[in-house]
């Protein structure tokens, strides 16, 4: 069931989203060669708690980190640990913050030091695909128009959209209905209504679209070992369009 949020709930979620955005800004200062993914996790946890929220992901289905940290060929759900970032890496950081019972959720992929032109293009296309999808986020539109816009743009740029992992509703639960694929035909699915809160999060591979989960039962990687990127915003559908909740 899709739960439309009240103005009061949206106010809380806007603040939760702002905390997520501020946490991204804080981590961005520290993303450089020589730092470990565990150190980034610790910085994020301290910062989120300082804002009066709690990390959404810590303990979620047994997840050990406060954030998901995925490097290079790792797509999503990377567990923070001893891995040290190197010049030329790309790192996807997925952050959730829970405030007064409601979640904010946003992911960004960052360059570490100097990255290749190919990796720059991967990041640019993935981020732009998010905004191509958001252009379709209007009341009365079908949900799959978002999906179709993302897939069309990504594939026209000669990249691949991951199909096993999808966007989702957000609220008192981190993952609510509806599920939002980032591929598919237009004009399908429920019509968007004011008060819906959605996490749109295209995951894009430089090579084939296929992924697998490692033995830790969390970290998802590309099958071909090529790099991948992930960009996500939590948005609210309004009377006239959408409002990005996960920004300052």
From Swiss-Prot:
Cofactor annotation: Co(2+); Zn(2+); Mn(2+); Fe(2+)
The keyword Protein biosynthesis is annotated on this UniProt entry: no
Any single biological process term in GO: proteolysis
Positions with a binding annotation for a divalent metal cation 2: 105, 168, 201, 232
Protein residues bound to a divalent metal cation 1: 94, 105, 232
EC nos: 3.4.11.18
Transmembrane segment boundaries: none
Free-text comment on the cofactor: Binds 2 divalent metal cations per subunit. Has a high-affinity and a low affinity metal-binding site. The true nature of the physiological cofactor is under debate. The enzyme is active with cobalt, zinc, manganese or divalent iron ions. Most likely, methionine aminopeptidases function as mononuclear Fe(2+)-metalloproteases under physiological conditions, and the catalytically relevant metal-binding site has been assigned to the histidine-containing high-affinity site.
Gene Ontology terms, MF aspect: initiator methionyl aminopeptidase activity; metal ion binding; metalloaminopeptidase activity
Location (main, coarse): cytoplasm
Catalytic activity entry: Release of N-terminal amino acids, preferentially methionine, from peptides and arylamides
GO cellular component, as recorded: cytosol
Keywords: Aminopeptidase, Cytoplasm, Hydrolase, Metal-binding, Protease
Subcellular location as annotated: Cytoplasm
Protein induction: Expression increases gradually during the log phase of growth.
A Pfam family annotated for this UniProt entry: Peptidase_M24
Keyword Nuclease: no
Chain residues that bind substrate: 77, 175
Similarity comment: Belongs to the peptidase M24A family. Methionine aminopeptidase type 1 subfamily.
Assembly notes: Monomer.
Biological role: Removes the N-terminal methionine from nascent proteins. The N-terminal methionine is often cleaved when the second residue in the primary sequence is small and uncharged (Met-Ala-, Cys, Gly, Pro, Ser, Thr, or Val). Requires deformylation of the N(alpha)-formylated initiator methionine before it can be hydrolyzed.
Protein name: Methionine aminopeptidase 1
Organism placement in taxonomy: Bacteria, Bacillati, Bacillota, Bacilli, Bacillales
């Amino acid at each position: 069931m899709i739960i439309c949020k009240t103005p009061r709930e949206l106010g809380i979620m806007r603040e939760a989203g702002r905390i997520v955005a501020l946490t991204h800004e804080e981590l961005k200062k520290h993303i450089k060669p020589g730092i470990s993914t565990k150190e980034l996790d610790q910085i994020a946890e301290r910062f989120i708690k300082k804002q009066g929220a709690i990390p959404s992901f810590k303990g979620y289905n047994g997840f050990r980190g406060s954030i998901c940290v995925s490097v290079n060929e790792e797509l999503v759900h990377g567990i923070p640990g001893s891995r040290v970032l190197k010049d030329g890496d790309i790192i996807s950081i997925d952050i959730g913050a829970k405030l007064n019972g409601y979640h904010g959720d946003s992911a960004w992929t960052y360059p570490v030091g100097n990255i290749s032109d190919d990796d720059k293009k991967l990041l640019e296309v993935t981020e732009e695909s998010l905004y191509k999808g958001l252009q379709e986020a209007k009341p009365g539109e079908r949900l799959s128009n978002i999906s179709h816009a993302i897939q069309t743009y990504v594939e026209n740029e000669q990249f691949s959209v991951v199909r096993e992992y999808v966007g989702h509703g957000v609220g008192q639960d981190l993952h609510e209905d509806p599920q939002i694929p980032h591929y598919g035909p237009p004009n399908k699915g429920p019509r968007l209504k004011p008060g819906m809160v959605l996490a749109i999060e295209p995951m894009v591979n430089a090579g084939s679209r296929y992924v697998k989960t490692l033995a830790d039962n969390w970290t998802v990687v590309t099958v071909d070992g090529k790099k991948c990127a992930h960009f996500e915003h939590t948005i609210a559908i309004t009377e006239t369009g959408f409002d990005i909740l996960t920004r300052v």
